[in-house]
């Protein structure tokens, strides 16, 4: 009962709305964002978008959580070792913002699948947090 009362509709976003105003919050709630790469930069960027109240987000990363990620990456915990980063973070993001329309693509970005990915979403913004040069070049080329 207390939890429900605390989490009244959009109440958790009231501080952001005070800062930005109702019109800008409505634009954020309607925004569609693509985040490619969920490592040391992308996972944090996607989480902040989620916490801001973005309405729709697609997250893309084929990597799994490795022990070497523990010192810097949001999805890296002992309980998540070996799990797909995209799946780990999807669970986290939905827990933060249950209303977010989240698409999870645990795929490696290649020149062949970039047009399909970009055509699928009609994105308002794209976050390029890719740490490998070839997919970064493919994405920037498109």
Each predicted region: which residue ranges?
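Hydrophobic residues within alpha-helices
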Residues: 45-46, 89, 139
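Short amphipathic alpha-helix with an adjacent loop that forms part of the alpha/beta core around
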Residues: 112-123
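Conserved acidic residues
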Residues: 106-108
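Rossmann-fold NAD(P)-binding glycine/threonine-rich loop
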Residues: 133-142
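Glycine-rich phosphate-binding loop and adjoining beta1-alpha1-beta2 segment
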Residues: 54, 59-97
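Glycine-rich adenosine-cofactor-binding loop
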Residues: 29-50, 56-61
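N-terminal charged helix/coil linker that caps or initiates catalytic domains
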Residues: 1-33
């Amino acid at each position: 009962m207390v939890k429900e009362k605390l989490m009244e509709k959009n109440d958790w976003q009231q501080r952001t709305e005070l800062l930005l105003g109702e019109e800008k919050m409505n634009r954020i709630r309607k925004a569609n964002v693509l985040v490619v790469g969920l490592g040391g930069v992308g996972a944090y960027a996607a989480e902040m978008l989620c916490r801001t109240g973005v309405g729709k987000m697609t997250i893309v990363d084929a990597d799994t959580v490795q022990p070497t990620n523990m010192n810097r990456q949001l999805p890296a915990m002992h309980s998540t070792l070996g799990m797909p980063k995209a799946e780990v973070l999807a669970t986290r993001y939905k827990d933060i913002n249950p209303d977010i329309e989240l698409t999870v693509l645990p795929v490696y970005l290649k020149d062949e699948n970039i047009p399909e990915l970009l055509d699928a979403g009609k994105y308002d913004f794209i976050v390029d947090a890719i740490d490998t040069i070839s997919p970064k070049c493919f994405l920037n080329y498109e």
